[in-house]
Structures are given as structure tokens and as C-alpha cells.
């Protein structure tokens, strides 16, 4: 009799735990969410549940529309053992003339949960991948490093890219920002479902690198973001970078229509209807027509300021105006850069041309006034050619003086790219948030060059010193294929410190943030910029006199 009662109590306990959303005790690979049951994969030291749809496929009549939550009910167990596919894209890092990758039906999330841990539940890191809003994918930022530490659940997100994600005519008919709206729906899915995987919905940290970092910032500028996440980190990208908020998108939208055979469209509604009828491959392949040379500009299609009457508009004001209004989510935020972030995309200037055998940077001596507005993203922000030429001349004089563009002067060209595309906006965004926000604002700079990074990949060269370029920090958190697996001892330490930093920030009960032995200093209420410097030798808090 006592045995029967004990068994009944045990069964009731299992039922209660299952109802509470915990991972099934009898089979941790079998997870139940509102759509039904799904089965993941055992990877030794972690479990993975990949390519779970969070939105209806954005195809057919749902192309160029606000994403719709995935409602299908599974009659059989969903197979979550296959890696996510890439959203269709024209990828910069593919050699050759055909850079097309991916498919249109791609709106999925993937969940990675540590195994063999003393914890039953984990804080959550949701990652928005980078790629200039044009390319990349959730699998681009590998999960092995984070899973090795066994301290957080990682969720990666696929979202629409390039023209499929960001074409816009600036009005309600074709408003744009579909990729950002995808991200937001995915974050809502995480909030509602992560407990079923052993995640803590009250401890969600949203992070992103480059365009992912800018996406994090843009998500944070919505007042309802605080309902989806506890804190946020933008690595080497924020909403104030000049390549983020696009101008001239209406003209590009109609030019896209002309390229794919919608040239007869005279209004946004007609253009949208025509574009919906065209093969996605044709639309994405048209990206090549918007590149001046190589992959420049690297973001021909990106976030837009939408019309207030657009359906479910994402942002209707410039980020600066949103911050000044104070109407954004008050969650702790960290923003970062690397000392030579401009190695992307300055490094491609060192690539030797097959026709002449000389580097592209040499051609800048004759093409600077033509190319600079595209390289540094002021082509659409200035009204006259004279304004552009005057600014181009000023930049060249400030960074090069009377020297010519050459391999020998590359370092100063890269410094220009770092300042204008990444570093300067960190200072401005921190300054604005400390003035008009209430929640903590943190910043750090990373200075520790990797052996192989974006500089070497884009230039195809190992004979040039690039410094600490774009991604050298984040690629110690999320492993990528082109970074050597045999990292230096200092990089192993930094990798662990970074991952612990994410865990600390997600779990923090007082909104503080720490890296190793260094506690970040809050910029809110400070007269000087508080910046944590991270190097191979450790970390140090610094004060910079750079606020206005």
C-alpha cells in the first residue's frame, strides 16, 4: 500500500514538473511546446533543438509582410535534429561571381542546452547574428564555446536579410524592416517557450555582433523590449552607426523592381504586388547591381524609418530622436568596439586585382571622390556632390595628410574606417543614453589581435598587420570556421571570461556587469565616459574626456 502511494506521488511530481515547463525527466530530448512535441539531439556535453519554426514561411503572399506566428500543430514529433538553413542572401564571403545562398523559408530558432550540469534551469542568451543585414545566419556564430562552459542556454535566430528583409519605399505599402520584425517575433517566442527547455524567462540576455549588435540596439529602442529581455549587449554595432539607418531606400526599391522586371510599377502597392510574383532568387541576385565594386557598399538594403501608418511599424523616428524622447526600454545595455574594427571592410582594399596585380587601395588615388561616399556611407545623406567632395577631401586630409593611398598608408585608412563606421557612434550612443535614459549603460573596447581574422579573410593576405579587427572578441565567444581551433592560452582565458560575463549579466539582480575581476562602471550620472579596456593582460577601467 505504501509503495502504491509512493508511486502515485512520484507520478504526480512528474506531471507537475512537466506542467511547469521543465525538460521531461524521462527523456530530455523530448520537449513539448504549444505546437506539439519535438525531439532534439544529444551532442555529448549538450543537447540541441534546432530549426524550430517561430513564424509562418514568409513566402507567396506573406513575402514583404509582417511575420505571422507559427500556428501549425504537429501530429507527429517534430524533428529538431537538423541544423537551420540560411535565409536567402547574396553572401560577401563566397568566392566567385555567384554569391547566392539559402532559402526563403528560414524563420526558425535553435536552442542549445548544457548537459551534465548541477543546474536544472539556466539563464538564456539570445543571439542576433551579424552580416550587414545582408548575409550570415544563426549557424555562422557557433555554439560549441558557450556549451563547453555549461552555464547558459543559447538561442540563435534566423531572420530575413537583404531585399527580402529590408526593401522599403518609405510608405505604408512597402514599409520595410521585415527582418527586424522577424527578430522581435523570435524574441517573443523565446520568452513564451524557453521554460520548456529549462531556460529562465526572467533572465534573458539579448546579444548581437555588427548588424546583430545594431539590431539589439534597435530592438531596445522599442518600449516593449523590457517585456522580452532583462539586458542587452551590442558588440561592434549600434543603431547610430552610419550604415544602419538607410536613406535613399525608395529609389533602390524601384530600381530593384526595374532589374527584376517590375519597371512598369509607378506606385508602392503595384511594385510590392509585382515583386511578390518574382522568384526570390531573382530578387536576391539583383543585389549585385547595387554594388559599386567588390561588396561596396556592404549594406545596400537595411533598416528604415517607417511611416507612422505602416502596419505594425517598427520604428517611425530616427534612433537619436527616440533616445532623446526617453521613450525606449530601460534595460541595462552594454556597447562595444574593437581597436581596429574598421578592418571590416577596409581590408578588402588590400586585395590584389587579377588584371593589374596591384591593390585596390592604389586605385583610391584616382577614385577617392567616387568611392568614399559608398565606403563610408554618406552617399545618400548629403544633398550635393560638392558637399560629398568637400567631406571626402576633409577626411583624406585629416587621416592621410599629403600622403597617397598605398599599402604603406593602409593603417591610417583602416583607422578612418574604424572611427567613422564603429568607434565614434559608441561614444555618441553612450552619451545620449546616459543623458536621456535611466538604466545602466556600459562600454568596453577590446584590444588583442587574433592570429586569423576578418582582415586576412577579406584581403587574402598574411603579410599585413591588421590589429584587433571586427569580430576578434566575439569569435572567442561564438566559434567560427575560419578562426583556428588551437587558440592561444590568453584567448582561452578571455573566451571563458567573456562567456562568464554573459552569464553574470543575465543573472545580475542589481543590473551590474563584470568581466573577470573588473566591474563595469555605469555611464549614467558620469561626467566622463567610463570604458573598460580588455587586453591579453587583463582589464582596466578608464575614463575618457569625450562627452559633449
Swiss-Prot record:
One of its GO terms (molecular function) is carboxylesterase activity. It is found in: Secreted. This is Esterase-5A. GO terms for cellular component: extracellular region. Residues 1-21 form the signal peptide. Its EC number is 3.1.1.1. Pfam families: COesterase (PF00135). Changing residue 355 to T: In strain: GB139E. It is an enzyme of class 3 (hydrolase). Changing residue 260 to L: In strain: GB336E. It comes from Drosophila pseudoobscura pseudoobscura. It comes from the Eukaryota. Changing residue 15 to I: In strain: GB4E, GB8E, GB139E and GB336E. Keywords: Disulfide bond, Glycoprotein, Hydrolase, Secreted, Serine esterase, Signal. Disulfide bonds join 87-106, 262-274, 518-539. The active site is at 210 (acyl-ester intermediate). Glycans are attached at residues 95, 116, 479. Changing residue 269 to V: In strain: GB4E, GB8E, GB115E, GB139E, JR198E and JR341E. Gene3D superfamilies: alpha/beta hydrolase. Belongs to the type-B carboxylesterase/lipase family. It catalyses: a carboxylic ester + H2O = an alcohol + a carboxylate + H(+). The gene is Est-5A.
